[in-house]
A protein has these predicted regions:
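Short, conserved acidic/polar surface loops in the N-terminal third of protein domains
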Residues: 90-95, 118-122
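An N-terminally biased module of ancient metal coordination in phosphate/nucleic-acid-related enzymes
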Residues: 1-89, 99, 165-169, 173-177, ...
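Short hydrophobic beta-strand that contains or immediately precedes a catalytic carboxylate
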Residues: 5-6, 105, 226
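Domain-core and long-helix interface of multi-subunit machines
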Residues: 102-104, 110-220
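Short acidic/histidine-rich active-site segments
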Residues: 40, 222-227
Length: 227
């Protein structure tokens, strides 16, 4: 069985750990045959003033150099240059048409912000109770579908599709209609989706996506990768 991991982070942001070399060395030691290094693509100072959750713009050249060096050090592995691009919706202040993503083989699209609110940040979890679980779920899938259906975005794959369940909050309604909309959006955008194992470590204690959502993607013929 081939082992791959297509969603990884490093110390190029404040919430990651280890260098690119350390990451790839560890992957090689566990028998992984393909890895994508997918640090969060830079955001503006207005969105991430301390680069806690995104890479500084001036670190991008060295980041790509480090990935190339790791690939050269492990010729038996596929070491892919990648990044994770946060979909910011109306708060987006980057012009993707003016940015060059040609150096990246694997570009993850993700939704960590709802109208400027980092809904999955433990420091901002209290707002869930103000907004309401059902409303957050509906808004999340609305924004996620906007991202997934956008052909102008640089994404090759949509990451952790139902990240909204991270804290274990579940809606009072059947989410299947939202799942159907998510699958339709991915098909419209021409993207892949990711099966992300990190959900097993959070309160939701479940892969992203949930089995029913993954089944919906499968039935729609959407290709998947693993991160």
């Amino acid at each position: 069985m081939e082992l791959v991991t297509m969603h990884t982070h490093t110390n190029y942001t404040g919430h990651g750990h280890g260098t690119v070399a350390e990451l790839v060395n560890a992957a090689a030691a566990t028998g992984i045959s393909a890895i994508a290094v997918t640090e969060h693509y830079p955001m503006s100072e207005a969105m991430d003033p301390t680069n806690e959750v995104s890479m500084p713009w001036d670190k991008m050249p060295q980041y790509l150099i480090d990935i190339a060096a790791a690939a050269a050090a492990h010729p038996a592995m596929d070491v892919l240059p990648g990044c994770e691009v946060d979909w910011l919706g109306a708060q987006e202040d980057r012009d993707f048409s003016a940015l060059d993503f040609s150096n990246f083989v694997h570009v993850l699209g993700s939704v960590h912000y709802l109208d400027g609110w980092a809904f999955d940040d433990p420091a901002q979890e209290a707002r869930w109770h103000d907004v309401g679980v059902d409303a957050v779920w509906r808004r999340y899938f609305e924004v996620w579908c906007e991202a997934a259906s956008c052909r102008e975005a640089p994404f090759t794959c949509m990451a952790h599709p139902d990240l909204v369940k991270k804290f274990g909050y579940r809606p009072s309604f059947n989410p299947q209609p939202l799942y159907d909309q998510a699958a339709e959006a991915v098909v419209a955008g021409g993207h892949m989706v990711e099966v992300n194992t990190s959900g097993l470590t959070y309160a939701c204690a479940e892969l992203f996506p949930a089995p029913d959502l993954l089944r919906t993607f499968f039935c729609a013929g959407i290709p998947c990768t693993i991160g």
